[in-house]
């Protein structure tokens, strides 16, 4: 049985309550957008919010979002009174941009929603009114996604400390890769990240003072399990055979995991 698309979940109660035809594109789009806003729970009510995140209250007891629908296709997003978090124009805006492709064509099996038509307005404390939504007919195609077995993977980590933490981690990576080459191991992919320096933003990371510590994170993938298992035996020796000031190896060898890939 195919799963329901997350943003489609509010559509049935809204149509049950207010009616509407299969070609009522604007109201169908409103239902999809309501679903898109609340599909990740408290992410629209203060969780994972970049805007003014320091001032969002009591995330330990965050309130989950509620949609109050209206017959005209507008709705208000709120949360239970007395709970933590915040529902505001910024929190709703950030969620609207989440997992977004073409904002003019948010394609679902029921309707194509135009996110560029959405308007937001404060509607009281922890209340945001959403209106102006427009939609158009769905396309004649449906999306198919397939999960399939695609080999094996393992990820190993070590932490290098000040002084010269990044330089040590980079040197350890060079040693590891040379060892893997000598062993004749062939990976479909190998990725090194220096967590704490540039793992998130890469070359866009600003140049600042020296990091106090850097995590070397190396992941590999291959169709052959034995190849990946051999990689896992090359991480721990770096503790004694590589650069100094290293820790983070108490968990033992990296674990080999089967890759469940996604298509397309």
Task: Give short role names for the model-derived ranges.
Residues 132-264:
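C-terminal non-catalytic interaction/assembly regions of soluble proteins
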Residues 11-24:
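A glycine- and small-aliphatic-rich helix-loop capping segment at beta-alpha/alpha-beta transitions
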């Amino acid at each position: 049985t195919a799963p329901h698309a997350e943003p489609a979940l509010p559509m049935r109660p809204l149509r049950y309550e207010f009616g509407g035809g299969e070609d009522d594109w604007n109201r169908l789009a409103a239902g999809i957008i309501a679903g898109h806003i609340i599909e990740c729970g408290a992410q629209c009510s203060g969780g994972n919010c970049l805007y003014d995140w320091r001032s969002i209250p009591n995330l330990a007891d965050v309130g989950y979002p509620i949609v109050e629908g209206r017959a005209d296709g507008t709705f208000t997003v709120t949360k239970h009174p007395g709970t933590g978090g915040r529902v505001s124009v910024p929190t709703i805006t950030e969620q609207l941009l989440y997992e977004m492709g073409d904002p003019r064509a948010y394609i679902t099996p029921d309707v194509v929603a135009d996110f560029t038509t959405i308007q937001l307005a404060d509607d009281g404390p922890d209340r945001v009114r959403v209106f102006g939504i427009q939609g158009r007919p769905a396309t004649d195609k449906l999306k198919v996604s397939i999960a399939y077995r695609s080999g094996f993977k393992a990820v190993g980590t070590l932490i290098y400390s000040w002084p010269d933490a990044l330089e040590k981690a980079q040197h350890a990576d060079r040693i590891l890769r040379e060892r893997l080459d000598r062993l004749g191991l062939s990976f479909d992919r190998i990725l090194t990240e220096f967590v704490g320096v540039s793992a998130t933003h890469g070359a866009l990371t600003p140049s600042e003072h020296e990091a106090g510590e850097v995590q070397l994170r190396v992941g590999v993938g291959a169709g052959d399990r034995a190849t990946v298992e051999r990689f896992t035996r090359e991480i721990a020796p770096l503790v004694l055979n590589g650069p100094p000031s290293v820790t983070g190896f108490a968990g033992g060898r990296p674990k080999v995991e089967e890759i469940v890939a996604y298509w397309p």
